C-alpha cells in the first residue's frame, strides 16, 4: 500500500516512523509536506476566557512560543497534544481522543 503524508516535515517523519513500526514493509511511505508552520508574536488577552482548548501540537507550540503562562483550565484533543502541552509547562485538565468527546 502507498501512503502520502502531507503534514509539516518533522511531524511527517514522526508519523511515518510510527506507521513503519506498526505496518512494516507493507507500506510505501512518501513524505511531501504541503505546509510549514510559522509562529507569530501576537497579544492575547486571556482574562475573559475560562479555559483553553488545544487540538494539535502546533497549537500548543504556538501558544508556548508566546511565552504565556496561564492558570486557565487546559483541554486537549489527543494524547500527544496533551503530552506536548505538559512538556510546555501547561497543566492539562482534561484530554479526549477527539473533539466530539471533549
Predicted segment positions?
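Signature of uroporphyrinogen-III synthase
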Residues: 1-102
